[in-house]
Amino acid sequence: MDELALLKRSDGPVTRTRLARDLTALGLGDGDTVMFHTRMSAVGYVAGGPETVIGALRDVVGERGTLMVTCGWNDAPPYDFTDWPQTWQDARRAEHPAYDPVLSEADHNNGRLPEALRRRPGAVRSRHPDASFAALGAAATALTADHPWDDPHGPDSPLARLVAMGGRVLLLGAPLEALTLLHHAEALADAPGKRFVDYEQPILVDGERVWRRFHDIDSEDGAFDYSALVPEGTEAFEIIGRDMRAAGIGRRGTVGAADSHLFEARDVVDFGVAWMEEKLGRERGPGG
């Protein structure tokens, strides 16, 4: 979308002051710990781009607050590279750079904000190559330290800590399907047919590049088969998000030109787990 179209969408430039005012009206406040997802084009013409958005968020949450984003790794080996011909695998293993929390780019599919935030002075990024998060603020280290190698969306993950800290989730123009926190609900849900993946990626151990095997829910293709519950072409998290809003959970407002939502992290996880267990059927043990 060209500049004029964006300017018309937002009725002029969206400034740091305007964003901070709109975020405050939505309910974000001083001391909040918030994971945010942003679709920049939905916000309109943001004067200054990602730095303006981050600046406005920091203005609102203040020195006691913390910002968190999901990063991933843009150049991570694909899960299925171990199915390649052996010579191709060997070539990749020999020279593929190790994941480095400081140097490795955030997944471009997550938009511009994660990369902008993780580069900020004082930002901290978790150690997991496939499921890394970055945070900036008072609770940044507490959120990201010692990210579990296996089950990185489950207990003691940055997502679990966000919930435990009374954190929040902001969708700044991003669709409901962007609710990454629902992967934590998938990890916790006691429902049949849960799907897992095992994959290998290179990490740094005492300064040396080492290939390590990881185990996680299938966050790429879905931890469950939602096909009987979700219309074709629609993401399961979008449907869960709509049902959550219909139940009166979260706040909705306009930030810049963007339709935006603010949720309590615990509400998202509690609703997501209950939805999955009800719709997919609770797992039954022997004799259950």
Swiss-Prot record:
PANTHER family: AMINOGLYCOSIDE N3-ACETYLTRANSFERASE (PTHR11104), SPBETA PROPHAGE-DERIVED AMINOGLYCOSIDE N(3')-ACETYLTRANSFERASE-LIKE PROTEIN YOKD (PTHR11104:SF0). Resistance to paromomycin. This is Aminoglycoside N(3)-acetyltransferase VII. Its EC number is 2.3.1.81. It catalyses: a 2-deoxystreptamine antibiotic + acetyl-CoA = an N(3)-acetyl-2-deoxystreptamine antibiotic + CoA + H(+). Belongs to the antibiotic N-acetyltransferase family. The keyword Cell division does not apply. GO terms for molecular function: aminoglycoside 3-N-acetyltransferase activity. It is an enzyme of class 2 (transferase). Pfam families: Antibiotic_NAT (PF02522). Keywords: Acyltransferase, Antibiotic resistance, Transferase. InterPro entries: Amioglycoside_AcTrfase (IPR003679), Antibiotic_NAT-like (IPR028345). GO terms for biological process: response to antibiotic. The keyword Transferase applies.
